């Protein structure tokens, strides 16, 4: 990942601002700071976009005092080129899920009744035009994902930079349910 970023850095010019979306405990960012500083020196600004209070990236601030490392809660950046990257970030965002049954689209919802969770289907007229999917198909839409991508792409189109998204999920053309719940 670091080699890829350094090669992009050399190709598109000087980008001193790096932002990780959803750094969790900061493992990837720590590795990147080590690698990138060897190639680019310490005139690099690192931004950590983490919405969850459950994860702590405080060790990055202690271990790398010579770098500018900022934790941010909103996707708002200085008017400069940025390089954004994330690992499994978009998987953690909420989705609205729809299922096609008897040639009709339904929104899948979770209902709590008598202290038990159950899946219910609510008819949805929004997808009536989507006919190429067969019964049993699942569509997942994330308004928050669209908002974040729009902000990042607008920033990149105005000020330049790059964006690396990686995910280790399986590739499947089949429209399947990807929601998981861990208790």
Show which residues each predicted segment covers:
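Conserved adenosyl
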Residues: 3-96
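Class I S-adenosyl-L-methionine
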Residues: 75-183
